[in-house]
Swiss-Prot record:
It comes from Saccharophagus degradans (strain 2-40 / ATCC 43961 / DSM 17024). The gene is mdh. It is an enzyme of class 1 (oxidoreductase). This is Malate dehydrogenase. It catalyses: (S)-malate + NAD(+) = oxaloacetate + NADH + H(+). GO terms for biological process: malate metabolic process; tricarboxylic acid cycle. Belongs to the LDH/MDH superfamily. MDH type 2 family. Pfam families: Ldh_1_C, Ldh_1_N. Its EC number is 1.1.1.37. Catalyzes the reversible oxidation of malate to oxaloacetate. NAD(+) binds at G11, A12, A13, G14, Q15, I16, S17, N105, Q112, V129, G130, N131. The keyword NAD applies.
Amino acid sequence: MKAPVRVAVTGAAGQISYSLLFRIAAGEMLGKDQPVILQMLEITPALEALKGVAMELDDCAFPLLAGMVCSDDPNVAFKDADYALLVGARPRGPGMERKDLLEANAAIFSVQGKAINDHASRDIKVLVVGNPANTNALIAQRNAPDINPRQFTAMMRLDHNRGLSQLAAKLDVTLEDITKMTIWGNHSATQYPDLFHTLVKGDVAVEQVEKDWYENDFIPTVQQRGAAIIKARGASSAASAANAAIFHMRDWALGTPENDWVSMGVYSDGSYGIEEGLIYSFPCVCKNGDWEIVQGLTIDEFSRAKMTATENELKEERDAVKSLLPA
């Protein structure tokens, strides 16, 4: 059996984490031969609820769960962490402007970025789930100057999976028939679900669907799926978000399948003309615990306009919190 790795999870008593922690402890994220120590962070008023979650984790008797830490101190929760899933974030309250939300989260993710910088493993892999995920990831990354910026990512896998399931339903195929789904940009309603490179049974997806369905049904459905779930369920996506987090981390740690790629919010190196330093979703392949942006895809005018619109939103979000970012 391998030596245990340390997995930090924030917002650990929340809805998403309740669907996430048990699957990590069961080996779904890092493999059935990898023991884990869960290092769970919560705000002080939620520590009692977190204690209950820890009791349940104990009661599952997971062979791979090698230990647990419950804390309200980021310096404790991120100590020597090999992986971090930043799930906890300030939700948008009634009458709250987007700028207020960005600023409230900037305070949270600045503190967590500093704690990661000061206490985590130098090889830590960070996934930000809490929204606005891309900009929260940027804030954490900027507050961790001693950690390679490539080690901070934002979750786009839920959007990616939503695209897969919508396309499979439309064409009456299985998910195994579809490869190379791509989501570009921000985890928001400006994201661009791109079918020009997606293959269904080896043939280009966009040629198998009507233009009107693609532009006026598929794209807005994927973009607005989160809001549709809140309307139907009365609460935001939790189990599907946890599932996407597991898939994102599993593929990053263990590798993506041959001849396929995944969508990840990653540190832009200027690929496809996207401003360097933004956390932007690109098609990525993973191997040996690292990711690479897929290069050489042809981008037409329709795609370019969509990619630029979501890039501009990310620039606006960054500029809204610029005063809170380290120089």
